[in-house]
Amino acid sequence: MSEAIENRNGRALVGVVVSDKNDKTIVVRVETLVKHPLLKKYIRRRKKFTAHDPNNECKVGDKVKIIEFRPVSRNKRWHLVSILEKAV
């Protein structure tokens, strides 16, 4: 099923898992760099996304790729595509 998900159009983000306490759910923190309009300095912005992890394979600290998907629940609109790097 992950191959079908990878081929979908939509936003794909890379982030770090900060929580895996819920069943089949992970919380992923995504960091982006935004240029400040006045200071012309890059600022690190962080946002948390709740993603669906059907096999409960992610652990805290894993670097993962998530993709925008149909709503699974009230807060989950993202789906785990792959684990890029396992936590030590």
UniProtKB/Swiss-Prot annotation:
Gene3D superfamilies for the chain: Nucleic acid-binding proteins
UniProt GO cellular component terms: cytosolic small ribosomal subunit
Keyword field contains RNA-binding: yes
BP-aspect Gene Ontology terms: translation
SUPFAM superfamilies reported for this sequence: Nucleic acid-binding proteins
InterPro entries registered for this protein in UniProt: NA-bd_OB-fold, Ribosomal_uS17, Ribosomal_uS17_bact/chlr, Ribosomal_uS17_CS
UniProt keyword annotations, A-Z: Ribonucleoprotein, Ribosomal protein, RNA-binding, rRNA-binding
Family of the protein in this entry: Belongs to the universal ribosomal protein uS17 family.
Name recorded for this polypeptide: Small ribosomal subunit protein uS17
Lineage of producing organism: Bacteria, Pseudomonadati, Thermodesulfobacteriota, Desulfovibrionia, Desulfovibrionales
Gene behind this protein: rpsQ
